[in-house]
Amino acid sequence: MTILLVGLGAALGAILRYQLTRIGNHIASEFPLMTFLINLTGSFCLGWLTGSQLSQPVTLFLGVGVLGGYTTFSTLNSELSQLWFRRRYHIFFGYWLLTYGLGLLVAAAGFYAGL
Amino acid sequence: MKIKESLAVGSFAFFGGILRYLIGLVLNQPTGFPYGTLCVNLIGAFCLPFLMRYIVARLHLSDQLALAIGTGFFGAFTTFSSFSVDAIRLVNQQQWSAFAWYVGISMVGGVLLSLLADYWAVKLTHNPEEQEVSQ
């Protein structure tokens, strides 16, 4: 049962990420803005969810499922690798440092907002 | 809306998310080091670029299947939100060295594995002998 909650949540989260990324494709920018925003908003929400300590099924569905499926680590690094191979070093380092720096910051902000 | 593509992404993400959860159950320690999240993230960081730039061309996968496996399965298998919240938990528990190792390995290891996968994919694609074998 918990497995189904996680799976369904992940499916919803991934579809949301896919639709947002499609919208983002219309923005002509070399900076992967959509993945960036998805990972930051997801980190904030999971921080909030963790801080507010809701019941286990809700946390599993929303946290492990929806937000786990919504945010992504593989696309982030794949985009970084592409920026490196295209020699866009400024964007590479900007995207890399901003994602991790702000990601940790908003996760902490979400956590304390949820307490 | 791309309903068909969305359903393909969602159904593969269903399994990606479940696999991440199961690996986390086995490897993550509630008060310790998030080995499970680190493990799925590093595997995904290598597999996604290698899939998109080598396997798709080699096996002539359709765009829709590539999208389902890449954006759906590997996108949901890996996670950034658990990474950042796990890291904040280590800070709250004042496990400074675990925090530094976790963030360091994720930050550097993730991008190195993607670079390696891309590099290897390009090398395999442009190697004439390799193409000979495949015929």
Swiss-Prot record, chain A:
Catalysed conversion reaction: fluoride(in) = fluoride(out)
Membrane topology note: Multi-pass membrane protein
Keywords noted in UniProt: Cell membrane, Ion channel, Ion transport, Membrane, Metal-binding, Sodium, Transmembrane, Transmembrane helix, Transport
InterPro entries in alphabetical order: FluC
Transmembrane segments: 1-21, 31-51, 57-77, 91-111
Ion transport in keyword set: yes
Regulation of its activity: Na(+) is not transported, but it plays an essential structural role and its presence is essential for fluoride channel function.
GO molecular function, one term: fluoride channel activity
Pfam families: CRCB
GO BP: cellular detoxification of fluoride
Location relative to the cell: Cell membrane
Binding site for Na(+): 68, 71
Main location: membrane
Gene Ontology CC: one annotated term: plasma membrane
Known role: Fluoride-specific ion channel. Important for reducing fluoride concentration in the cell, thus reducing its toxicity.
Family recorded in the similarity comment: Belongs to the fluoride channel Fluc/FEX (TC 1.A.43) family.
Name assigned to this protein: Fluoride-specific ion channel FluC 2
Organism ancestry: Bacteria, Bacillati, Bacillota, Bacilli, Lactobacillales
Gene that this polypeptide is encoded by: fluC2
Curated annotation (Swiss-Prot), chain B:
Binding residues for Na(+): 75, 78
Subcellular location: Cell membrane
TM regions (residue ranges): 7-27, 32-52, 65-85, 96-116
Catalysed reactions, semicolon-separated: fluoride(in) = fluoride(out)
Membrane topology: Multi-pass membrane protein
Keywords, in A-Z order: Cell membrane, Ion channel, Ion transport, Membrane, Metal-binding, Sodium, Transmembrane, Transmembrane helix, Transport
Keyword Cell membrane in annotation: yes
GO-annotated cellular components: plasma membrane
Regulation affecting activity: Na(+) is not transported, but it plays an essential structural role and its presence is essential for fluoride channel function.
Gene Ontology process terms (BP): cellular detoxification of fluoride
Keyword Ribosomal protein included in the entry's annotation: no
Single GO MF annotation: metal ion binding
PANTHER family hit by this protein: FLUORIDE EXPORT PROTEIN 1-RELATED
Role description: Fluoride-specific ion channel. Important for reducing fluoride concentration in the cell, thus reducing its toxicity.
Similarity comment: family membership: Belongs to the fluoride channel Fluc/FEX (TC 1.A.43) family.
UniProt protein name: Fluoride-specific ion channel FluC 1
Natural source organism: Latilactobacillus sakei subsp. sakei (strain 23K) (Lactobacillus sakei subsp. sakei)
Gene name linked to the record: fluC1
